[in-house]
A protein has these predicted regions:
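Thiamine diphosphate
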Residues: 112, 116-119, 124-227
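N-terminal hydrophobic or amphipathic helices/low-complexity stretches enriched
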Residues: 1-16
């Protein structure tokens, strides 16, 4: 990746993080930690990887994206706003009654949402179904789904993984946001799903493990996934929960807590300073 592209992605990711904090603060509820950890992944997907058109969000030939860890919708919404699906002003109305952006993705109410999600474990099943439909219809689109590391404790994840492998869904790419923390504590202590890579390999997936905040690594992983034949792919992205906001990083308490006014102002100052530094390069 050239330096100009990388700089632009970092700048956009900083704006996505600002949007996450803005939305969750105004809603007085939501899930900032996992949204921030996935911000770089959302950014790369919507600005480099996905074949999409914000002016034609229902294009039958578009790539599909399913946010299986639907509670991290603030990150997805912030990326969609930056990509032009709707105004960034909508982020300030997150979770408001009747607003476009609800607490979990709603495919009927929000442009750019391919699947309603939030019940953990179900998104991957929907994504696998979309991928199979693409095969049946002889379509070239690809399907992507972002899962949480705590989410993969759900049995339905592995039923869908078995289905995807059995049907040779090489047009399906999963991303696991492995930030190591879930609502009840460290993932390793709650159910201990590791080694995740070996599990997916046993289920017939092509597996890569990367730094989920390194755009060069993200680019290389998605490029490789598109070369894989006759099997689905999974990218295990090692990330930092709360990435970008110093007091939120690696703190389980920020899984599903909104910042108060003082915390909001601190977060916005940090993220704005980071953005200005990037824009000054």
């Amino acid at each position: 990746m050239n330096s100009c592209d990388k700089q632009q992605l970092k700048t956009t990711a900083a704006k996505v993080r600002l949007g996450i904090i803005e939305g969750v603060y105004n809603a007085k509820s939501g899930h900032p930690g996992g949204s921030l950890s996935a911000a770089d992944i959302f950014t790369y997907l919507y600005f480099k990887e996905l074949h999409i058109d914000p002016q034609n969000p229902k294009d039958p030939d578009r790539d599909r994206f399913v946010l299986s860890k639907g509670h991290c919708a603030p990150g997805l919404y912030a990326a969609l706003a930056q990509r032009g699906y709707f105004s960034v002003d909508e982020l300030k109305k997150l979770r408001y009654i009747g607003a476009m952006l609800q607490g979990h993705p709603d495919m009927k109410g929000t442009p750019g949402i391919d699947m309603s999600s939030g019940s953990l474990g179900q998104g991957i099943s929907a994504a696998a179904g979309m991928a199979l439909a693409g095969k049946i219809d002889n379509k070239d689109y690809r399907v992507y789904s972002l899962l949480g590391d705590g989410e993969i404790e759900e049995g339905q994840v592995w039923e869908a993984a078995m289905f995807a492998s059995h049907n040779n869904l090489d047009n399906l790419c999963l991303i696991v946001d492995f930030n190591g923390l879930q609502i009840d504590g460290p993932v390793s202590e709650v159910a201990g799903p590791e080694p995740i890579d070996k599990k997916f390999e046993a289920f017939g997936f092509d597996v890569q493990t990367i730094d989920g905040h390194d755009f060069d690594a993200i680019e290389a992983a998605f490029a490789h996934a598109k070369t894989v034949k006759s099997k689905p792919s999974v990218i295990i992205a090692k990330t930092v929960k709360g990435k970008g906001v110093s007091y939120m990083e690696n703190q389980v308490g920020w899984h599903g807590t909104a910042p108060n006014k003082e915390q909001y102002e601190t977060a916005m100052q940090e993220l704005t300073a980071a953005l200005h530094e990037l824009e000054g390069c």
